[in-house]
From Swiss-Prot:
<keyword id="KW-0324">Glycolysis</keyword>
<keyword id="KW-0488">Methylation</keyword>
<dbReference type="GO" id="GO:0005507">
    <property type="term" value="F:copper ion binding"/>
</dbReference>
<dbReference type="GO" id="GO:0071456">
    <property type="term" value="P:cellular response to hypoxia"/>
</dbReference>
<keyword id="KW-0963">Cytoplasm</keyword>
<feature type="modified residue" description="N6,N6,N6-trimethyllysine">
    <location>
        <position position="354"/>
    </location>
</feature>
<dbReference type="GO" id="GO:0005886">
    <property type="term" value="C:plasma membrane"/>
</dbReference>
<feature type="active site" description="Proton acceptor">
    <location>
        <position position="183"/>
    </location>
</feature>
<feature type="site" description="Necessary for preference for fructose 1,6-bisphosphate over fructose 1-phosphate">
    <location>
        <position position="358"/>
    </location>
</feature>
<dbReference type="GO" id="GO:0031930">
    <property type="term" value="P:mitochondria-nucleus signaling pathway"/>
</dbReference>
<dbReference type="GO" id="GO:0006094">
    <property type="term" value="P:gluconeogenesis"/>
</dbReference>
<keyword id="KW-0318">Glutathionylation</keyword>
<dbReference type="Pfam" id="PF00274">
    <property type="entry name" value="Glycolytic"/>
</dbReference>
<dbReference type="InterPro" id="IPR000741">
    <property type="entry name" value="FBA_I"/>
</dbReference>
<feature type="binding site">
    <location>
        <begin position="266"/>
        <end position="268"/>
    </location>
    <ligand>
        <name>substrate</name>
    </ligand>
</feature>
<dbReference type="GO" id="GO:0006096">
    <property type="term" value="P:glycolytic process"/>
</dbReference>
<feature type="modified residue" description="N-acetylserine">
    <location>
        <position position="2"/>
    </location>
</feature>
Length: 358
């Protein structure tokens, strides 16, 4: 039983439930300056503040897109940015019924005593930062822990360390009014089969919920952002129905019914793959006490980015590409995606990056 008694408890529960509204999901636009620089470089656009702002403004002002979203995760820079007409992005999102979120981790560092496994930094001063972000309008937060599958990985040490880091982050967020998104990402890198991924996912999620319980985290005021259960990147692909079955079973075995929603990361899948897999999960006839939705970054932005190319004259077309993906994923949260989205440039290409750094 959680003994959590934050003054924010009712607000946390309401906001977590709202983010998990079927038909809506999260746009992850919280790429660090370095990561968004790589995205911009792929379309030959310079990584300067004005270009980063232009890309985010393109996304946030797309007609018809925001009704498909319940939240947008921002990088600290974007939390304080304004659109070209002077409207703060936070106000723009809130007026459209979209909750602003904030990435609060400080990236990964190697975990001593392991074979290249990592732990996530950012707990120092986290309470003060959360307080500041809440005052700036943020209502949820994200912290990414990263695990990998190998012959002996993930080690028990890495699982424990990352689970407890996520739990400490979660309770600090809740003390300061932010709904924590708990993100234990198991990288798709490797040649393992889907059964191996399922077994590891179950181990990791079980450890996370034990840690959250130990820290008295209010589960009704949290969200889970896991990987889908898939074969490794060097293995043969399987059908969306197979991914759906293995993923939902792993979640049934480990995620308490008190959690309102599970928002999947795309993990380097192509835009279309990620949507089809989410749709298959929502079509599955089985027990699902939580809503199943999306928190996609690359899988919502790739075709938009390619279409835009940094050119003002392409903004309208790029926004049309973004709307296509938003609508497709909105339908997938209802199990209603027909696979008929007009595929923009790059929509079918794998977005996998080995050992991905966010």
């Amino acid at each position: 039983m959680s003994s959590f008694t934050s003054k924010f408890a009712d607000e946390l529960i309401a906001n977590a439930a709202y983010i998990g509204t079927p038909g809506k999901g999260i746009l992850a636009a919280d790429e660090s300056t370095g990561t968004i620089g790589k995205r911009l470089a792929s379309i030959n656009v310079e990584n300067v503040e004005s270009n980063r702002r232009a890309l985010r403004e393109l996304l946030f002002t797309t007609p018809g897109a925001l009704p498909c979203l319940s939240g947008v995760i921002l990088f600290e820079e974007t939390l304080y940015q304004k659109s070209s007409d002077g409207t703060p992005f936070v106000d723009m999102l809130k007026s459209a019924g979209v909750l602003p979120g904030i990435k609060v981790d400080k990236g990964t560092v190697e975990l001593a005593g392991t074979n290249g496994e990592t732990t996530t930094q950012g707990l120092d001063g986290l309470g003060d930062r959360c307080k500041k972000y809440y005052e700036a309008g943020a209502r949820f937060a994200k912290w990414r822990a990263v695990l990998k599958i190998g012959v002996n990985e993930p080690s028990q040490l890495a699982i424990h360390e990352n689970a407890y880091g996520l739990a400490r982050y979660a309770v600090i967020c809740q003390e300061n009014g932010l709904v924590p998104i708990v993100e234990p990402e198991i990288l798709v890198d490797g040649s393992h089969d889907i059964q191996k991924c399922a077994a590891v996912t179950e181990r990791v999620l079980a450890a996370c919920y034990k840690a959250l319980s130990d820290h008295h985290v209010l589960l009704e005021g949290t969200l889970l952002k896991p990987n889908m259960v898939t074969p490794g990147s060097e293995s043969a692909k399987v059908a969306p129905e197979v991914i759906a079955e293995h993923t939902v079973r792993a979640l049934q075995r480990t995620v308490p019914a008190a959690v309102p929603a599970i928002v999947f990361l795309s993990g380097g899948q192509s835009e279309e793959e990620a949507t089809r897999n989410l749709n298959a999960m929502n079509q599955l006839k089985t027990k699902k006490p939580w809503s199943l939705s999306f928190s996609f970054g690359r899988a919502l932005q790739q075709s938009t980015l390619k279409t835009w190319g940094g050119k003002e004259e392409n903004v309208k077309k790029a926004q049309e590409a973004f709307l296509v993906r938003c609508k497709a994923n909105s339908e997938a949260t209802l199990g209603a995606y027909k696979g008929d989205a007009k595929l923009g440039e790059g929509a079918a290409e794998s977005l996998h990056v080995k050992d991905y750094k966010y």
